[in-house]
Structures are given as C-alpha cells and as structure tokens.
A protein has these predicted regions:
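N-terminal phosphate-binding or glycine-rich loops at protein starts, especially the Walker A/P-loop
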Residues: 3-53
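Short, ordered loop/turn segments at secondary-structure junctions
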Residues: 12-14, 41-47, 81-82, 114-117, ...
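Internal, active-site/partner-interface "lid" segment
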Residues: 172-179
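Glycine-rich oxoanion-binding loops at beta->alpha junctions
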Residues: 51-107, 116, 144, 155-169
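Short, acidic/small-residue loops that bind anionic groups at enzyme active sites
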Residues: 38, 125-154, 161-163
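Short glycine-/acidic-enriched loop or helix-start segments at secondary-structure transitions
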Residues: 19-20, 50, 120-122, 149
C-alpha cells in the first residue's frame, strides 16, 4: 500500500515501556510507504485541538533515530486523558479537528493507546464517514491493563506483568534474609 498524503499520529493514556516502539513502527512504516510528512500530536487529541503538533520527519532522519525512539521511556509525544464528547453534543470540536487535519493535508490518522484512545478513533472515524472525509483512522492498541475488547494481549501488558513478577521475586528474596 502506498500512502499518498500526510500522516498524523498521537499517543494518549498512561505510558508503557513500549508505547514509543509503536510510535516508531507507525513512523517508519508511513515513511517506507511514501508518506510525505508524518506529524506527531503533542499531548494527544487535546494537543491537536490546541494546534500543538510537530513534523516528526524533521526530527527523525536516520535508522539510529528510530532505534533510539524505540528505547525512549515514557511517551515521546506526550499524552492526555482528554475524552472527546459525543458528536451530537459538540459538533464544533469535530469541525475544528477536521479543519486542522485538512490544513495539514492528513490522509492517515493513527492514535496509540487503550480504551479511551480507541473510543476517540471510533468517534473520529464515525464523524469522517458522516462528513464524507477520505481520511483513514486507525487505532494502535497499547495498554498495561490488557482490557481491550477482541484482543488476546496488547503491547504494554507483558512489560507490566514482567515488572510485577520481578518486583514480587525481589520482595520474597528480601523477606528471606531474616530469621
């Protein structure tokens, strides 16, 4: 698939140790498939509403940059917990988002996160259909809770489970040092 047009990607919800790996994957795939520019939303959909975005194509130029991004802790682009209102309750918010996406010539919209992020993608996709937009909206699942419907597991869950298991092992070992 050739990606004609520009891409935008955002992160939301709690950070995991792998959220930036997902971001690196979206960026690399978009560039490999011909996307002109890959924009990153600063602080998720809330940042987009505030017109806070960066041209990631200017920041990530080499394979080493991508590898470093994969290993960067926390959320590289920043996060938010902002929930989009229902379309019927606040059409103006959606109009503003789509105006910004049109200005940036966005054809592909990726959002990395858990349940609320997937809800955001669904609402934007539904509004896009309603308005006749040709923007493709895709959710990239990431959650330490492993509670997304119709998924066996998500990136982030294994890291959290390993952390808890390692911590418990250390607590048990510490407890064994005393009589």
């Amino acid at each position: 698939i050739i990606m004609l047009g520009n891409v935008i990607v955002g992160q939301s919800g709690g950070p995991t140790s792998v959220i930036n790996s997902s971001l690196a994957g979206v960026f690399k795939t978009a560039k490999d498939r011909g996307a002109k520019k890959v924009y990153g939303m600063r602080h998720g959909i809330k940042g987009l509403l505030d017109r806070q975005y960066v041209d990631m194509s200017e920041k990530i130029k080499t394979t080493m940059d991508i590898e470093l991004l994969k290993r960067t802790p926390s959320s590289y682009l920043g996060s938010c917990r902002y929930k989009l209102p229902e379309i019927k309750d606040d059409k103006e918010t959606y109009d503003k988002i789509f105006q910004i996406l049109d200005e940036l010539e966005i054809k592909y919209f990726f959002y990395i996160g858990g349940n609320d992020s997937m809800d955001t993608i669904k609402k934007l996709s539904d509004y896009g259909v309603l308005m006749g937009s040709d923007i493709k909206f895709m959710g990239v699942p990431k959650t330490i809770d492993n509670d997304l419907a119709v998924t066996d597991h998500t990136p982030g869950f294994g890291s959290a489970a390993k952390f808890i298991a390692s911590t418990m092992k250390e607590i048990i070992r510490d407890g064994l040092v005393y009589d």
